[in-house]
Amino acid sequence: ACRAVSDIMCNGILPSSLEFMEKDAVLFVRDQNYADLPFKIEEKTESYLLIELDGSNKEQLFNEAEKIYTLIQKYACGKVIVADNKTEQERIWKVRRSIGLAVKAFSVYKEEDTVVPRANLVKLLEGVKLIGATYNFKSICYGHAGDGNLHVNILKDGLTHYQWDVVLNKAIREIFELCVKLGGTISGEHGIGFIQKKFIDLDS
């Protein structure tokens, strides 16, 4: 899904919303009973894009939708759901809005707010998962893909206090180092807060 984001934007289409949700994020919403999924989760599916178009010219909107459909077929796209009424739109948006709540209900977590050029979203996501495997933590990732923004929710789950309070800082620094290396920033969409101040040297 991340690979399709840059392609969509580079073809002159500017969705009003372009959201990324990895499969585990959607599973959390379902398993924590925060939303009834308006689609079936396929075993081979790895992630989802929520694409919203806006405008007053119906013909132009249909043309853009068809163009997007054609573009995403290059990326092993599965079933495409078209939400053409308010009820269906709200059902899909509820899944996206419920991810943070579902994560919070499951475990103590740390949310790292990252942003990179859209073309590097795939490398960022792959890097986050590799760092997670190295430091033995699970992450739930989602975000505003159209802006290159990725929320990385790191779950405490089975980590010891030492791993959570000490070792994880090394992992988070590696995530932010990767962001900067990929041409991004550690400030994401929310700026640099108290928690991220210790990593501010990476953004200089």
Question: Whereabouts are the PLM-identified features?
Answer:
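Noncatalytic alpha-helical scaffold of FAD-dependent oxidoreductases
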Residues: A1-S204
